[in-house]
Amino acid sequence: MQWQGRSVRKSTGGRYSPSRGKRRREIGSAPAETHIGIDRRKISRTYGGNNKVRALRCEYAAISNAKTGETKKVKIETVEENAANPNYVRRNLLTRGAIIRTELGRARITSRPGQHGVINAVLIE
């Protein structure tokens, strides 16, 4: 877990003296790192008692075709390009903005699998 807070150092290099310790609500969570595989999801409690569905593995994506206006559930074959990190292509990690190869062709992921629990994509070829 990582604390998503202010830096301990000032711009001059000095240290801020903490007025209090960390709170549970201020601690972030580890990235979901969604892979290609048989569907596996995890439900985690978030701030305010709400739930967040994290996709750990996904096999299918809902791909929309802008020309015809229809959406189909299509199997994901592989990750071809990922602007977030070149290593994600080798590891076949699914993130928002990644370009995936499917049975219909190439598509760009528009949803956030680690936050939404589903993979929505737009056909680009």
From Swiss-Prot:
Keyword Ribosomal protein: yes
GO annotation (BP), single: translation
UniProt GO molecular function: structural constituent of ribosome
Record-stated family: Belongs to the eukaryotic ribosomal protein eS8 family.
UniProt keywords, alphabetically: Ribonucleoprotein, Ribosomal protein
GO cellular component, one term: ribonucleoprotein complex
Subunit organization: Part of the 30S ribosomal subunit.
Entry protein name: Small ribosomal subunit protein eS8
Gene name in the database record: rps8e
Chain residue ranges for the region called Disordered: 1-34
The keyword Calcium appears for this protein: no
Highest taxon, organism lineage: Archaea
